């Protein structure tokens, strides 16, 4: 099992989750997916559900769904909903029993609040998962990636590596190789994958504690 988090919203966690899931399926692994909390509709869950051909209901895969495209704590407040962490845990345990390998995707970045005194990073810790961090290749990513990795480690969470999702064409990013080296050197973390698109990617599966 693995938790897919990222340096920001819109960084490509859903896209990378789907690609990773399809790779594992092609290797004969019975892989499932879960997005514990989704704000702004059901689009992310629906996309990965479709890509992986999962038969689970949306509620099973996404136990907390909020309509407003805001931080979960704010969206829940506006919608007058109480986010039940035990409900998330129960859904997680059920899917964990059903699948050989489970990909759990976060919402936004690691410091996004789910509810009072409970961040995305706290959810990763609560579910006792290791994680990968999805990042971008362009200017600013060194800072964002290192801060994210450091925050997770201070919470006692193991970071297996970073996957660069090229939301900007990497060939148009000046000195991107030096950027990636800096992430690894100063963040003391390995870049285990680079995703250009659905057909052009590399992910080092040996780093993911596969069954």
From Swiss-Prot:
Q: Which GO terms describe its biological process?
A: biotin biosynthetic process
Residues the record lists as binding ATP: 10-15, 44, 105-108, 165-166
Q: What is this protein called?
A: ATP-dependent dethiobiotin synthetase BioD
Q: Where in the cell is it found?
A: Cytoplasm
PANTHER family per the UniProt record, alphabetical: DETHIOBIOTIN SYNTHETASE
Q: Which Pfam families match?
A: AAA_26
Catalysed reactions, as listed in the record:
(7R,8S)-7,8-diammoniononanoate + CO2 + ATP = (4R,5S)-dethiobiotin + ADP + phosphate + 3 H(+)
Q: Which family does it belong to?
A: Belongs to the dethiobiotin synthetase family.
Q: Which InterPro entries match?
A: DTB_synth_BioD, P-loop_NTPase
Q: What does this protein do?
A: Catalyzes a mechanistically unusual reaction, the ATP-dependent insertion of CO2 between the N7 and N8 nitrogen atoms of 7,8-diaminopelargonic acid (DAPA, also called 7,8-diammoniononanoate) to form a ureido ring.
Q: In which pathway does it act?
A: Cofactor biosynthesis; biotin biosynthesis; biotin from 7,8-diaminononanoate: step 1/2
């Amino acid at each position: 099992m693995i938790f897919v988090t990222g340096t920001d919203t819109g960084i490509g966690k859903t896209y990378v989750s789907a690609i990773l899931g399809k790779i594992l399926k092609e290797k004969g692994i019975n892989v499932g997916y879960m997005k514990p909390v989704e704000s702004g509709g059901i689009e992310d869950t629906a996309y990965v559900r479709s890509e992986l051909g999962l038969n689970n209901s949306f509620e099973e895969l996404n136990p907390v769904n909020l309509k407003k495209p805001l931080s979960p704590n704010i969206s829940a407040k506006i919608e007058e909903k109480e986010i039940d962490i035990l409900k998330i845990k129960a859904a997680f345990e059920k899917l964990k029993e059903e699948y050989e390998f489970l990909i759990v995707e976060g919402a936004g970045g690691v410091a996004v609040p789910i509810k009072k005194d409970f961040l995305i990073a706290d959810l990763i810790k609560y579910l006792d998962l290791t994680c990968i961090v999805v990042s971008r290749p362009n200017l600013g990513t060194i800072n964002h990636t290192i801060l994210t990795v450091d925050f997770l480690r201070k919470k006692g969470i193991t970071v297996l590596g970073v996957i660069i999702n090229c939301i900007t064409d990497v060939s148009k990013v000046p000195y991107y190789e030096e950027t990636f080296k800096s992430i690894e050197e100063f963040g003391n973390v390995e870049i285990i994958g680079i995703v250009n698109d659905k057909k052009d990617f590399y992910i080092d599966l040996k780093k993911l504690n596969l069954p």
